[in-house]
Design a protein with these regions (language model features):
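Short glycine/threonine-rich loop-to-helix capping motif typified by GTGT followed
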Residues: 137-143, 178-190, 232-245, 273-283, ...
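Flexible, glycine/charged-enriched surface loops at secondary-structure junctions
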Residues: 80, 159-170, 201-224, 262, ...
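Intrinsic disorder at enzyme termini
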Residues: 261, 319-391
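Conserved, mostly hydrophobic/aromatic
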Residues: 21, 77, 195, 258, ...
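Mobile "lid/hinge" segments at catalytic clefts and subdomain interfaces of large enzymes
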Residues: 120-155, 249-304, 308-320
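Accessory "access/gating" subregions that flank catalytic or transport cores
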Residues: 151, 155-159, 169-177, 189-239
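Catalytic alpha/beta active-site cores
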Residues: 1-180, 184, 210, 256, ...
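Phosphate/diphosphate-binding loops
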Residues: 55-58, 101-113, 241-244, 320-337
Length: 391
């Protein structure tokens, strides 16, 4: 992930990273600087057909960003049907974090879908369940609320007369990855199964010839969940920070075995300073080791057939489905957010997990298990959150 302070510097960094084996990039761009020249400078010499490009900016400027990207891709004569990427628009995440609405979801979502109509593989409606994970939610909570989150997009936009297949193909799930190795593998497997069932309930019809067209004309590819995963910051520690490398490595392994489409490994020092070239290189190489040396990307579902993981998958699916149904009974994810139900449940989990760590019922290596009592914090201070605009 690249936070863009200068498009020229960000471009140089992106090209350097691409030459080191990465095939998916994410840019956090400043909304107030957006224009055609900015995009051209940022993406100069990047082959958009060879790499997945993901973007995020202030929610009020996502349509402007989409228009600029489409214009740039057309200018470069790319085959727009082959380009893959996303624009991180998430109306509900803002409500979850700030407790207030900003803009009109249906209006903005429709404009985004129309703006990216020529980019069929670009996802522009995001479910940032990562926020729940980083706030301390349990695995079943993260998955259950994520499903309700995605279903809220489906429900509201199909009511606005947008075909279900189009809506489903524009949704992207961004999950967090905790240190529960086997449970996380099971979570991603359960997520795909449950989401497919939810989408199928909307009877998405194929709008054109499709290889995955079902016997009744349903679009099977619409039911496929697009998943990005990011290692959690909830368990990253300021003390004995290099132990964070152990946590992020096992988290990346579980996501890869769980079958995610892409992942971000958070640098081990992100909680107390701006990651430098060293920590970013380590984070990048943690992924490349799994791909290039362990070949985790060569098997579709390596956990399939494992009695333990199959049972965990069913168990997590049941728990998450119960949470999903409870949210739907309350009127849907939007209603639950306005009532504060989701926030209250996650806050309770956060308190319970902190208490468990304090009582050593939840192990945090290097903190409550085998701590270094001689280590001092020094200049280390927790990094404060910043606005999504980059300000």
């Amino acid at each position: 992930e690249i936070k863009v302070e200068s498009p020229k510097e960000a471009n140089a960094k992106a090209l350097d990273i691409l030459n080191k084996g990465i095939d998916s990039l994410s840019f956090h761009v400043k909304a107030k600087e957006l224009n055609a020249e900015y995009i051209e400078t940022l993406l100069n010499d990047s082959c958009a057909e060879c790499v997945e490009l993901n973007f995020s900016t202030c929610q009020g400027h996502v349509v402007e960003l989409a228009d600029l990207l489409v214009a740039y891709f057309q200018k470069k004569d790319y085959d727009l049907t082959k380009l893959q990427g996303s624009i991180n628009y998430d109306f509900f995440n803002k409500m979850l974090a700030k407790g207030k609405e900003k803009g009109n979801m249906v209006q903005t979502a429709k404009a985004l879908i129309e703006a990216t109509a020529q980019l069929p593989k670009y996802r522009v409606l995001n479910v940032n369940a990562l926020t729940l994970n980083n706030a301390g939610a349990y695995i079943s909570q993260e998955l259950g609320y994520a499903l309700a989150w995605g279903n809220e997009y489906m429900n509201q936009l199909t009511e606005a007369e947008i075909p279900a297949a189009i809506v489903a193909k524009k949704i992207k799930f961004n999950f967090g990855i905790s240190s529960n190795y086997f449970l996380e593998i099971a979570k991603f497997r359960a997520a795909r199964m449950l989401w497919a069932n939810i989408v199928a309930s909307y009877n998405p019809e194929c709008l054109r010839d499709c290889e995955n067209k079902g016997p009744n004309g349903e679009c099977r590819c619409a039911a496929k969940m697009k998943v990005h995963a990011e290692t959690s910051t909830f368990n990253l520690t300021l003390f004995d920070a290099h132990v964070n490398l152990l946590r992020t490595q096992t988290e990346a392994m579980s996501a890869a075995l769980g079958g995610v489409d892409s992942m971000t490994v958070v640098p081990f020092d992100k909680t107390y300073e701006t990651p430098d070239e060293f920590s970013e290189r380590l984070a990048r190489n943690q992924q490349l080791l799994l791909k290039e040396e362990s070949h985790f990307d060569k098997v579709i579902d390596p956990a399939a057939g494992s009695y333990y993981i199959e049972n965990l998958t069913v168990s997590i699916a049941k728990q998450a489905w119960e949470i999903f149904l409870a949210v739907e009974e309350e009127g849907g994810f939007y209603a639950a957010l306005k009532a504060g139900t989701v926030q209250a449940a996650v806050n309770e989990s956060n308190k319970a997990r902190h208490k468990a760590v304090a009582q050593r019922r939840e192990v945090l290596l290097g903190t409550n298990q085998f701590p270094n009592f001689n280590e001092k914090a020094g200049d280390k201070k927790p990094v404060e959150a910043t606005c999504c605009c980059g300000g």
